[in-house]
Regions:
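Enriched for short, Lys/Arg-rich terminal
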Residues: 1-4, 9-23, 63-86
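Short proline/glycine- and basic residue-enriched helix-capping loop/turn segments at helix->loop/beta transitions
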Residues: 32-37
Length: 86
């Protein structure tokens, strides 16, 4: 695959993370770009179509469409799966 694209929301989420978490997320984004199905897990129910990768207490939420990975949000696990825009 290729480097994941980030939505405006995901870029903003990334900028607000603590430095150590941001570094771990960037490493995970590299892995997602290589093997997105292996790094994350497919979500079900109302979040069907999204994938989620764990990074400590944070979750990287993304979609895989036509070989392109689009990161939609990077949120703390307590709020990652709540209704809202992903």
């Amino acid at each position: 695959m290729s480097e994941p694209r980030l939505t405006r929301r995901a870029r903003k989420d990334l900028e607000t993370l603590p430095q150590t978490v941001r570094e771990a997320v960037l490493e995970t984004l590299t892995l997602i770009g290589i093997e997105p199905e292996r790094v994350g897990r497919k979500l079900v129910g109302r979040l069907e179509g999204l994938w989620s990768a764990r990074v400590g207490h944070y979750r990287v939420l993304y979609t895989i469409e036509s070989g392109t990975v689009l990161v939609r949000a990077i949120r703390h696990r307590a709020v990652a799966y709540r209704r809202g825009r992903h």
